[in-house]
Amino acid sequence: MHPITPVHYLALSAALLLIGTVGVLTRRNIVIILMSIELILNAVNINLIAFSHALQNINGQIFAIFVITDAVAEAAVGLGILIALFRNKETVQADEIDLLKW
């Protein structure tokens, strides 16, 4: 059995970042876009934890906790806006929402 090295964590983080970026760029459903943004933030957290562990410095882990709390607040605000838009427009497709257009 081989030990898990920081390279494994970075590969996992790169895969999550790629999946999240593709989801944000290709999907039009706002729920899927929010989930993809959360995947990107989780990739950032894995990077922070991996480098924190490799460098024997706790600052990365503390910063990851702040990123998690920021992601929770972002998800709450995003879902609140999504519910308000759904009640107003009856759709969650990003292409059909033109509330900010004149």
UniProtKB/Swiss-Prot annotation:
It catalyses: a quinone + NADH + 5 H(+)(in) = a quinol + NAD(+) + 4 H(+)(out). Keywords: Cell inner membrane, Cell membrane, Membrane, NAD, Quinone, Translocase, Transmembrane, Transmembrane helix, Transport, Ubiquinone. Belongs to the complex I subunit 4L family. It holds the Pfam family Oxidored_q2. One of its GO terms (molecular function) is quinone binding. NCBIfam families: PRK05715.1-2, PRK05715.1-3, PRK05715.1-5. The keyword Transmembrane helix applies. It comes from Solibacter usitatus (strain Ellin6076). GO terms for biological process: ATP synthesis coupled electron transport. It is found in: Cell inner membrane. The chain crosses the membrane at residues 4-24, 30-50, 62-82. GO terms for cellular component: NADH dehydrogenase complex; plasma membrane. It is an enzyme of class 7 (translocase). Its EC number is 7.1.1.-. This is NADH-quinone oxidoreductase subunit K 2. InterPro entries: NADH_UbQ_OxRdtase_chain4L/K, NUOK/Mnh_C1-like. NDH-1 shuttles electrons from NADH, via FMN and iron-sulfur (Fe-S) centers, to quinones in the respiratory chain. The immediate electron acceptor for the enzyme in this species is believed to be ubiquinone. Couples the redox reaction to proton translocation (for every two electrons transferred, four hydrogen ions are translocated across the cytoplasmic membrane), and thus conserves the redox energy in a proton gradient. It comes from the Bacteria. NDH-1 is composed of 14 different subunits. Subunits NuoA, H, J, K, L, M, N constitute the membrane sector of the complex. The keyword Membrane applies. It is a multi-pass membrane protein. PANTHER family: NADH-UBIQUINONE OXIDOREDUCTASE CHAIN 4L (PTHR11434:SF16), NADH-UBIQUINONE OXIDOREDUCTASE SUBUNIT ND4L (PTHR11434). The lineage of its organism: Bacteria, Pseudomonadati, Acidobacteriota, Terriglobia, Bryobacterales.
